[in-house]
Curated annotation (Swiss-Prot):
The keyword Glycoprotein does not apply. The modification N-acetylserine is found at S2. This is Transforming acidic coiled-coil-containing protein 3. The gene is Tacc3. It comes from the Eukaryota.
Length: 631
C-alpha cells in the first residue's frame, strides 16, 4: 500500500511534502493540469530563493485534506490523514449531513464559479469541431449529470456483473457495507460542491435522488469486496463528467471534492474481487479507458471534526511564505505583461475581493447541445440502468498517477485563444432551470430505482438458481471424489495383485531353475551311486580273496611260531651259560684289581718318605751353604 500526498496548490512545497505532520511520499507528476496551477506556481516562490521579486497574488493557505482556509490558530492543527480506502473500514459521514452554503462571499463565489464555467465552455467550444468524442464527453459542463448511485449489496446473491460506461469511464467509489438507513437526497449548490455521503446499510424504504451541482458531477468510487454477499449488479452510466479538482469554498464536511477547470478523464480504480461470491465480469469502456490506479486503504479513523467558519480568517502571504512578497496584482492588471494565466488570477481576485462587481461584458459561450445530451442520458438510463445507491466520494485518493494513455484533446489548454472580454460573468441558469433539472433527475432516479428493483429480483432468482446449481455441483463433485477415491483404492489393489503376480512368477521361475539344477544333481548322484555299487562288488571279491590269503598266512604263522619257540629256548640256554662264565671272569678281575690297588698304595707311601728325606737334605744343604757364605 502506498500513500500519496495530494498536489495541493494552496500549500507550499515545504508544507505539503516535507512537513513533519505528513509522513507521505512526495507528490508525483501527472499528465493532467489543475486549475490555478500556473498562477500558484508563480505566486509561490521557490525554496532556493531568499526573496520573491514580484508576486501577483497569493491565496490563503488551505488544509491539504479538507481544503479549508487555515486560520492563525489552525496552522499547527492537522486533521485526520488522507482518505484511503480499505476492504474493511471506510470514511463514513453523518447520515443527515447537508452541504453548507458559503456564509459571507456567496455573490463573489458565484461570479468566480461563472468565470470558471465560462472558461470551460470556451475551451469546449474550441475543441468541439476537432473531436466528436471530446464534445460528447464535455456535454456535462452544460447540463447537470445526475450522480450514479451504487446498488445496495444484497445478502445472499451470486454473480456481480459490473457494466462500465461506454464513452468515458469515471472513477468508481467503493460500495460500502449495507446499513438499515435511508439515503437522503443531497441537492448540491451551484458553486460549492460538498462531499456525498457514503452508502450505508440498505434501508427498507425507497432510494431518494441525489442531484449534483451544475458545475461538478462527483465520480463513483470502486466497488469493494462484499464480505458475505452474493450477486450485486453495478451498472454505470454512459455519460459521466469527470471530477473537477479545486474547491472554491470550504465546507463543514469531512471530504470535499476537488474542482478542475480542465476536463481530464480520471483514472479508473480497480474493482476488487468479492470474498464469498462467484465470478464478477467487468465490461470495460468501449472508447476511452483511463489507466487503473491501485486501491488505497483508509486509515482507521473517524469523521473529521467540523471546523467553524468563524475561526477561519485570511492570512497575509508574508506570514505564510516568510518572505516580503508584494501583492501587485492591481498594478499589473491591464498591462502588456498580463499573461494568459491572469484568467485564473482574476478568478481568485474576484473570489476574495467582495468589492469587485460584475462586468457588463461576458465571453461568448459555446451553444450547449442540450438535446443530444438529454437523448444520450435517456439512452443510457434506458439501455444501461445505473446503480440506485449513493456512494461516498474519495477526492483525496491517489490522483497523481502518470497517465499512460494519450492525453485527451480536451485536456490541452488552448494558448492564445482567450477572449479579450472581461472575465466576470453573470449567472447563466436561473433557479427555475435548476428546479426543472432537479425534477428531471428525480424522475430519472425513480425510473432507475424501479429498474434496479426489477434487476435485483432477477438477480435474487438467479442467485437461488445458482445456489441450487452449486448444491448439485457440490454433490456431483462429492460423488466424483468418492468415485475417484474408490478408483484409487481399486487401482491400489490392482497394483498389489500385479505385484504379487510378478512375485509369484519370479518365484516360479526361480523354483524351475532350482528344480532343473536339482535334477541335474540327481542324475550326477545316480551315476556316482552306480559307480559305488560296481566298486562294492569288486571290493567284495577282493575281500574274499584277502580272507583266503589270511588263512594261508595264519597257517604259516603257526609253523613259524613253533620254529621260533625252539630257537628261543636254545638261545636262552646259551645265554645262561654265557652269564655264568661272565660272573667267574668278573670275580677274577676284581681280585686282580684289589691286588693292583694294594701295590699302588705301598708305592705312594714310599714316595712320601723319599720326598720328606729330600726336603730334610735340602734344608741341611741350605744351612750349610748359608754358613759357608757367612764364613
Amino acid at each position: 500500500m502506498s500513500l500519496h500526498v495530494l498536489n495541493d496548490e494552496n500549500v507550499p512545497n515545504e508544507k505539503s511534502s516535507q512537513c513533519r505532520d505528513f509522513q507521505f511520499l512526495p507528490p508525483e507528476l501527472t499528465g493532467r493540469s489543475s486549475v490555478l496551477c500556473l498562477s500558484q506556481k508563480e505566486n509561490v516562490p521557490p525554496q532556493s530563493q531568499a526573496k520573491a521579486t514580484n508576486v501577483t497574488f497569493q491565496t490563503p493557505p488551505r488544509d491539504p485534506q479538507t481544503h479549508r482556509i487555515l486560520s492563525p490558530n489552525m496552522t499547527n492543527k492537522r486533521e485526520a490523514p488522507f482518505g484511503l480506502q480499505n476492504d474493511h473500514c471506510v470514511f463514513l459521514q453523518k447520515e443527515n449531513q447537508r452541504p453548507l452554503a458559503p456564509v459571507d462571499d456567496a455573490p463573489v463565489v458565484q461570479m468566480a464559479a461563472e468565470i470558471l464555467r465560462a472558461e470551460g465552455e470556451l475551451q469546449e467550444g474550441i475543441l468541439t469541431s476537432s473531436s466528436l468524442s471530446a464534445s460528447t464527453s464535455l456535454l456535462d459542463s452544460e447540463l447537470v449529470t445526475p450522480p450514479i448511485e451504487p446498488v445496495l449489496e444484497p445478502s445472499h446473491q451470486g454473480l456481480e456483473p459490473v457494466l462500465e460506461s461506454e464513452l468515458v469511464t469515471p472513477p468508481v467509489e467503493p460500495v460500502l457495507e449495507p446499513s438499515h438507513q435511508e439515503l437522503e437526497p443531497v441537492l448540491e449548490s451551484e458553486l460549492v460542491t460538498p462531499p456525498i455521503e457514503p452508502v450505508l446499510e440498505p434501508s427498507h424504504q425507497g432510494l431518494e435522488p441525489v442531484l449534483d451541482s451544475e458545475l461538478v458531477t462527483p465520480p463513483i468510487e470502486p466497488v469493494l469486496e462484499p464480505s458475505h454477499q452474493g450477486l450485486e449488479p453495478v451498472l454505470e452510466s454512459e455519460l459521466v463528467t469527470p471530477p473537477i479538482e479545486p474547491v472554491l469554498e470550504p465546507s463543514h464536511q469531512g471530504l470535499e471534492p476537488v474542482l478542475d477547470s480542465e476536463l481530464v478523464t480520471p483514472p479508473i480504480e480497480p474493482v476488487l474481487e468479492p470474498s464469498h461470491q462467484g465470478l464478477e465480469p467487468v465490461l470495460d469502456s468501449e472508447l476511452v479507458t483511463p489507466p487503473i490506479e491501485p486501491l488505497l486503504e483508509p486509515s482507521h479513523q473517524g469523521l473529521e471534526p467540523v471546523v467553524d467558519l468563524k475561526e477561519e480568517s485570511f492570512r497575509d502571504p508574508s506570514e505564510v511564505l516568510g518572505t516580503g512578497a508584494e501583492v501587485d496584482y492591481l498594478e499589473q492588471f491591464g498591462t502588456s505583461s498580463f499573461k494568459e494565466s491572469a484568467w485564473r488570477k482574476q478568478s481568485l481576485y474576484v473570489k476574495f475581493d467582495p468589492l469587485l462587481k460584475d462586468s457588463p461584458l461576458r465571453p461568448m459561450p459555446v451553444a450547449p447541445i442540450t438535446n443530444s445530451t438529454q437523448d444520450t442520458e435517456e439512452e443510457s438510463g434506458s439501455g444501461k440502468p445505473t446503480e440506485a445507491e449513493l456512494v461516498n466520494l474519495d477526492f483525496l485518493g491517489d490522483l497523481d498517477v502518470p497517465v499512460s494513455a494519450p492525453t485527451p484533446v480536451w485536456s490541452l489548454e488552448p494558448r492564445g485563444l482567450l477572449p479579450a472580454e472581461p472575465i466576470v460573468d453573470v449567472l447563466k441558469y436561473s433557479q427555475k432551470d435548476l428546479d426543472a433539472v432537479v425534477n428531471v433527475m428525480q424522475q430519472e432516479n425513480l425510473e432507475l430505482k424501479s429498474k434496479y428493483e426489477d434487476l435485483n429480483t432477477k438477480y435474487l432468482e438467479m442467485g437461488k438458481s445458482v445456489d441450487e446449481f452449486e448444491k448439485i455441483a457440490y454433490k456431483s463433485l462429492e460423488e466424483a471424489e468418492k468415485q475417484r477415491e474408490l478408483k484409487e483404492i481399486a487401482e491400489d489393489k490392482i497394483q498389489k495383485v500385479l505385484k504379487e503376480r510378478d512375485q509369484l512368477n519370479a518365484d516360479l521361475n526361480s523354483m524351475e531353475k532350482s528344480f532343473s539344477d536339482l535334477f541335474k544333481r540327481f542324475e550326477k548322484r545316480k551315476e556316482v551311486i552306480e559307480g559305488y555299487q560296481k566298486n562294492e562288488e569288486s571290493l567284495k571279491k577282493y575281500v574274499g580273496e584277502c580272507i583266503v590269503k589270511i588263512e594261508k598266512e595264519g597257517q604259516r604263522y603257526q609253523a613259524l611260531k613253533i620254529h621260533a619257540e625252539e630257537k628261543l629256548r636254545l638261545a636262552n640256554e646259551e645265554i645262561a651259560q654265557v652269564h655264568s662264565k661272565a660272573q667267574a671272569e668278573v670275580l677274577a678281575l676284581q681280585a686282580s684289581l684289589r691286588k693292583a690297588q694294594m701295590q699302588n698304595h705301598s708305592l705312594e707311601m714310599t714316595l712320601e718318605q723319599k720326598t720328606k728325606e729330600i726336603d730334610e737334605l735340602t734344608r741341611i744343604c741350605d744351612d750349610l751353604i748359608s754358613k759357608m757364605e757367612k764364613i
